[in-house]
Every structure is written in C-alpha cells, then in structure tokens.
Amino acid sequence: MIETLLQSPSSWTNFFIFFGLAVLLLFAVLGFVTYGILAERKVMGFMQGRIGPNQVGGRFGLLQTVADVLKLLLKEDSIPKAADKPLFILAPVIAFAPAFMVLAVIPFTDKFQFADIGVGLLYYIAVSGITTIGVVTGGWASNNKYSLLGGMRAAAQMISYEIPLVMSVIGIVLLAGSLNLNEIVAAQENVWYIFVQPIGFVVFLIAAVAELNRTPFDLPEAESELVSGYHTEYSGFRWAFFMLSEYVYFFGMASLITVLFLGGWNPVMFLGFIPGAVWFALKFSSVVFLLIWFRVTFPRIRGDQLMEFGWKVLLPIALANIFLTALIKELFF
C-alpha cells in the first residue's frame, strides 16, 4: 500500500493518507514508550528483588506511566532567567524530531515501511546524529554548569562511539551488497547475520548502548554527578521531550538490531507459518529485554574509561572485522 502511494501522483488525498499513517506510527511509538518504561521498571524491580509499580491501574501498575505523563503535563514549565530562551525552547524539539524521523526507514515487515530508500542504513545513522545537537544546545542554553558538562559529555560520547557503530555494520553492507534495509533482511533468509558477523554484532550492541546514553554509558545525565545532566533545568513537558527522544531511540535501535543481525521478520527454520510481524515482535522484545538487563547489571564507568574503550578497543576490533569480512567474502563467496 505504502509503495503504491509513493509511486502515485502527488495529491492532497495522498498527503492526508501519509499524515494519518504518520500519526498512527507516532501513537504506536508513544504506546511503546509508555509501556516500555513500565516494562523496564517491572523487570528492574524483579531483578532487584522488588515489586515495581503496583498501585495505579491494578496490581501490575498498568496505568502508572500514564499517570506520570499526566503529572508532567500539569507541572510548571519554567525557564531560568539566565537561560538563552529561544535555544532553550528549541533544544527539546531538535532532540526529538530526528528520533521520530529515523523510524521512517525501518522495515517492520515486508509490507510495512514508510520509506524504502536505497540508503536506508546511511539515512538512519546520519539523521540520528542530529539529536546530539539538541542535547548540546539544551546544555549550553540552560546557562548551568551541570547542564553544560552533560551536553559536552554527550558530544564527546557520540563522537567516540558513532565511528565504531558505523564501522561495525560495514561487514553487513559487504555481505548484503546494499545499504537498503529490506535487501539486508532478504539476504538473511537462510542465515542471520548474528551468526555470520558475531564480532560486528558485539561491537554494534556496545556502541548502540553508548549512543542511547544508557547504563553503563549514561555519563551525560549521571544523576550522582551532574544532578540530571543536560536536562537539569528542564521541567514539565520540555523535560518529557528529552525522555521521549531517548525511548524512541531505544525503540528505533532495538528495531535496527533486529533488522541488521536477527533477520528482521524472517522466521526460524520450519516455522514459516507464523506471520513475519510476530517474528519481528519476538526478536525486538528480546533485544529490549537484553538492553534493560544491561542497565540493571553494569555499573557506570568513568569518563576516561569510556573514551579509551571506544577509541582503543571498539574501533580497532571494528576495523579488524571489516578486513576479516572482506577477506572471507573475496576467498569464499
């Protein structure tokens, strides 16, 4: 359906159809964010020997996150007197908009994707980097030392881990011969790339956690060091925009890992009768659980350790993986 619309002449009808689909995707993502946060809190509670949310919405706390959102909407929206007001207001939007834009190229099934472009993987990596501009802008515009330090940490972390992230997927591009995410999924019909590219998967997973600013790489918003990091001065809905962008990227990165390394919607052998959307959801949920598990398990590392690990460990391993993949492809394929 979407491919037919893309190839049809421009019209207001097509515009409103695309707008409606975009709104549906936005609500689907917001639903994931709402209950993804709840699931994270419940899993963390279980792993730490606690119950987790259990008051609002029954014994499982099903409406706890909804109540939190309503609370944020009702909070005062304050702007510090010394802040750069235009940039302070604009920063959350700059941080959130790219997070939603990258979802356009993710193929959730073979029939559901907003933009099937030839350089989908490159588009995702390029657009996702814009969010750091919003983070740094918010930190600087707040005119707060903690916020500025958080923004600078975010910039340094993004530079350090964006390179290994990109390098780790070059092996996949070499094997699939394309930057198109649909073609990468199709190339995994017989064997998933997690088995062909285990080194690339490990490097990508670690770099992805760093890009998401999640534990153990959550230095830009380290509560015990920087109060709340780059969004210390934000409150209410503007603060919610920063949190929303973080969890939308969580959704996007888990989807991208599913597409690149877990075969997307391709089924396990002899279970092809199960719909592709179900397979995608199962793989996606496994990645989300793994990332939550990381948050509970690992302590935060120091800034110097973060930089050294990115430049001295991940980058050389990613480069070695490229040469190894090119050699194997040249000799055996």
UniProtKB/Swiss-Prot annotation:
GO biological process: aerobic respiration
One GO term describing the cellular component: plasma membrane
Membrane-spanning ranges: 15-35, 88-108, 117-137, 159-179, 191-211, 239-259, 274-296, 313-333
One term of GO molecular function: quinone binding
Entries under InterPro entries matching the protein: NADH_UbQ_OxRdtase_su1/FPO (IPR001694), NADH_UbQ_OxRdtase_su1_CS (IPR018086)
Key words, A-Z: Cell membrane, Membrane, NAD, Quinone, Translocase, Transmembrane, Transmembrane helix, Ubiquinone
One Pfam family here: NADHdh
Main location: membrane
Compartment annotation: Cell membrane
Substrates-to-products reaction catalysed: a quinone + NADH + 5 H(+)(in) = a quinol + NAD(+) + 4 H(+)(out)
Entry's EC annotation: 7.1.1.-
EC top class named in words: translocase
Keyword Magnesium: no
Membrane topology, as annotated: Multi-pass membrane protein
Function: NDH-1 shuttles electrons from NADH, via FMN and iron-sulfur (Fe-S) centers, to quinones in the respiratory chain. The immediate electron acceptor for the enzyme in this species is believed to be ubiquinone. Couples the redox reaction to proton translocation (for every two electrons transferred, four hydrogen ions are translocated across the cytoplasmic membrane), and thus conserves the redox energy in a proton gradient. This subunit may bind ubiquinone.
HAMAP family: NDH1_NuoH (MF_01350)
Similarity-based family: Belongs to the complex I subunit 1 family.
Complex and partners: NDH-1 is composed of 14 different subunits. Subunits NuoA, H, J, K, L, M, N constitute the membrane sector of the complex.
PANTHER family reported for this sequence: NADH DEHYDROGENASE SUBUNIT 1, NADH-UBIQUINONE OXIDOREDUCTASE CHAIN 1
Protein name, per record: NADH-quinone oxidoreductase subunit H
Classification lineage: Bacteria, Bacillati, Bacillota, Bacilli, Bacillales
